Amino acid sequence: MTHNDVWTAIDRFATSKKMSCSGLAKCSGLDPTTFNRSKRWSKEGQPRWPSTNSISKILASTGAKIQDFTKYIDEPDAASHV
């Protein structure tokens, strides 16, 4: 599992809930910019990973289980869930 895999899963999960990443963050009680693409890498080029707390909050706010999220990590075609 890579940095990109986790961020792609968040993007796909948000889409599956008919939300933008910003909308998903806001719905979850997070800052709306939490999942912005600009925050996925530091200014020094180091990857920033989403926190387990953030993932926990998006699951709780949507009533999803961890399996509902992790299925998007290895999914080759997100279009089937749009």
Model-derived regions: residue spans:
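A short, Lys/Arg-rich alpha-helix, primarily the initiator
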Residues: 1-27
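Recognition helix of helix-turn-helix/homeodomain-like DNA-binding domains
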Residues: 29-48
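Short, charged recognition helix plus adjacent turn
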Residues: 32, 37, 60, 67-82
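Short, basic-rich loop-to-helix N-cap that marks the start of a DNA-contacting helix
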Residues: 43-60
